[in-house]
Amino acid sequence: VIGILGLFFRFGGAFNYTNSINWESAARLSSNLLNETILDDVQALYRVKSIAKRAEELEVINLTPQELSEKISAIGGTFNGKDFDGSFTRTITTERLAEQPQSINIVLGESYGLWPFLSEYNEPGAYLVEQGRKYAASPQAMSTQLALAQGTGTMPAINGLLTGMPDTGLYPNYEGESFKQPYGLGIGSVMKKLGYKTVFWYGGFSTWQNVKNFTLSQGFDEFHDASEMPSEDGNAWGVGDKDLFKAISAYMDQ
């Protein structure tokens, strides 16, 4: 009996991940305090163990200035002898735009397949990505079919956008150094330097994977999540795209 109860609590009130209140998906409310009360004691202990295990798996790499210069050069940078961000900074000599855009919107989508845009899937593609094909055909649009995914999950992709660095399993959203100052190559830092107000909209919940605190530490002025968006078909992971973009549109109309 004790073993069965232990298994039950291990998965957070169920015998499988899908129906459980797992520590990675228990953040359903906007209050950190209430989210902590939702999480049962065994799952809370399992969370500590999981995060500690991830941190232990990280490697400390010490490079000499010469080795650092060689590695920066190998990925297109010019080592300036001072810092990483400066080694990848480029200053333009000719302005490309006569007028700076009033707003710039970047959509980071998970599991958005390219196949509906391909000619061999023209019939379903014409319906599924009708608007997307119109944008792609615009003379002002650009696209590529040669790209690598930032990572294998949601947080690695978000980390890549926020830090400007490739995913190497370092978990920057949990690293204390990440909260001391923003990464210079992250999208928030770049847009702030260009004079923009930075607003991050997340279709999930803010306390998942520490995403809100991490985002605000990386040069974003505001963070909005699923708890602020009316939705009738939301789930443990957040709201649907329709409700997300509806909330964003209403905000931009203000």
Listing of model-derived features with the role each one plays in the protein:
Residues 2-16:
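Internal/C-terminal transmembrane anchor helices
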Residues 13-254:
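Soluble catalytic regions of membrane-associated enzymes that act on cell-envelope
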